[in-house]
Amino acid sequence: MISSHEVSAPSGSAQWRSIDWKAVERHVLRLQMRIAKAIREGKHGKAKALQWILTHSKAAKLLAVRRVSQNKGSKTPGIDGDIWNTDARRMAAVSLLSRKGYRAKPLRRIYIPKKNGKLRPLGIPCMIDRAQQALHLLALEPISETIADPNSYGFRPNRSAADAIQQCFKCLCKKGAAQWVLEGDIKACFDKIGHQWLLDNIPTDKRMLKQWLECGYIDKGLFYKTAEGTPQGGIISPTLMLLTLVGLEKLTKSIARKTGSRVNFIGYADDFVITGSSKEVLVNDIKPQLMAFLQERGLTLSEEKTHVTHINDGFDFLGFNARKYKGKLLIKPSKSNVLSFLRNMRDLIRKHATIPVADLIKMINPKLRGWANYYRHCVAKQTFGYVGHQMFLALWRWSVRRHPNKGRKWIAHKYFLNLQGQWTFHGWFKKAGKYGVIRLFDIAKVPIKRHVKIMSQANPFDPFWEGFLNERKVKNTGRNSWFDPVATAL
């Protein structure tokens, strides 16, 4: 017989690997649905009590640790240099998620380039702070999804830029549709949201929220306080911004009822468009009310990026251009986005002048495929053909520069396959002792499929929408499963 002291407790790694994640997710989802139901019924006290139960449950703590330790940023440390890269560390971290004695550490400030050449500051929290934010986000998201504007599509589950663009099409495509568009952009939205407004209005643990808002950041060894804004890089920040802007659509609709105008709101994060039947309504009625709404929250409209445009002149939104041509609405990839993408691809090719062809193709293909997937729901066939041709020219120049003493015919046969009369850039690779050929992704062959927009009122925390969202997920998975083979073993 084995005595009790001879039986060792399972290690942290073994405990983590033995977790039934489906059961954990079901437990958390049940609580989230109860929170959403309480909000729909106006029982805010009950919702607050359920939030407390959720944030103190082991299931929610497990999910929070898994999210921050296994996502894309999990290998990027905060100021303490700590990362949870083993199962044992993840299991140990679960017990650290306590409200008692918690104090958020300053963020590690880094800078990433923006499209306009400027630098965007990002604040990287420590792992424990990320996990605490992820934990409280589990309790906050059911509320944000229940009260969010129906036609707001950024930073929300089951929603995408494609949904926002399809809503633009729906609002503008008909003959009698509104002809004027207010393109709105909120200036430095994440950096300027007022702390007091957040503390007074966000339905979450105020003490924890205050910690995250006022933790400050360290930049080049110096500590700086934060008097406004939410940290770009914090897991909970997008939802805080979403809740800050809740009510924009309701505001525009109330103005429309008073003026008798046709007005529609489409939002995505801090970008939005408002369609109106006249320029006067947008400029004189809508815009002043928007500015007052934002000012209350410490925000302002960007004068550079906020315009009122006629639909016949077109407007850019989320990298797309929407414009009517002889009364017909066409939504295409924006010219600036196409040129920017090609510039980046040419730079990538130019910087890797000496690497093996197969390695270059492996770098290019995911970028081409991702860009095509983003735009394949709009009128993009001609654009895809143009991008494909420009890629051919860039890779031809790359091939010629590698062999200045060789003839064009020799270069063509070395780097390009003739497939049914079409020259395709290709390379060779060796894997497990076998040779194979890898081809450039043919963006011109990407099929155009109209995106089916999510229903505006759909809520993943309402059982009523469960069947609809599951069916939509299956359909979208099927739509995304088209495949153009690019690697073949011989």
What are these regions (language model features)?
Residues 96, 115, 147-151, 156, ...:
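Conserved polymerase palm-domain catalytic core
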Residues 297-363, 367-371:
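A conserved non-catalytic segment of reverse transcriptases
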Residues 1-9:
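Short, charge-rich, low-complexity alpha-helical interaction segments
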